[in-house]
């Protein structure tokens, strides 16, 4: 079974990679996720994914005294609406604010993936568009009380209860979850790491 290092504590990213047939070893490393002044969404998520990768790589080398034998994957997701980058809500009040902002409108979900393997590093940004139905204050309150919006970019989970708010998606469902499958496997192949199923060849 193919092995990957995942520089993330996200259970959703772990689930996606495991479902693809990889054996996943968690290697999360924390970084400062503050948005820089004037930073736009795509450069921001790409910088986050790359900085997470470097932090996880440094942690691995310090712990093991060598570079990892298998690919190290990191990713970052953000939601962009009305010119504002929405990360993970820091409180229930902020989650309510985010959901009110998304209600009845289209927003953009960007996920950046960064992979290091055998001395080479590759990163890519994948973009999706999501349309929310208009949300009532009662729906928002009940959803926030469920706890699901916390620790989720934009304060919702497309694969969870939050999916009932979504009218349409343009892009990748897995990308909105936090790790776009097509792009991730393509990047691994480009770096010389084959997917679990040998039938998946270019």
Swiss-Prot record:
Its cofactor is a divalent metal cation. Pfam families: Maf. It is found in: Cytoplasm. GO terms for molecular function: dTTP diphosphatase activity; UTP diphosphatase activity. Nucleoside triphosphate pyrophosphatase that hydrolyzes dTTP and UTP. May have a dual role in cell division arrest and in preventing the incorporation of modified nucleotides into cellular nucleic acids. HAMAP family: Maf. SUPFAM superfamilies: ITPase-like (SSF52972). This is dTTP/UTP pyrophosphatase. It catalyses: dTTP + H2O = dTMP + diphosphate + H(+); UTP + H2O = UMP + diphosphate + H(+). Belongs to the Maf family. YhdE subfamily. It is an enzyme of class 3 (hydrolase). The record marks 12, 77, 159 as: Important for substrate specificity. One of its GO terms (biological process) is nucleotide metabolic process. The active site is at residue 76. GO terms for cellular component: cytoplasm. Keywords: Cytoplasm, Hydrolase, Nucleotide metabolism. It comes from Neisseria gonorrhoeae (strain ATCC 700825 / FA 1090). It comes from the Bacteria. Disulfide bonds: none annotated. Its EC number is 3.6.1.9.
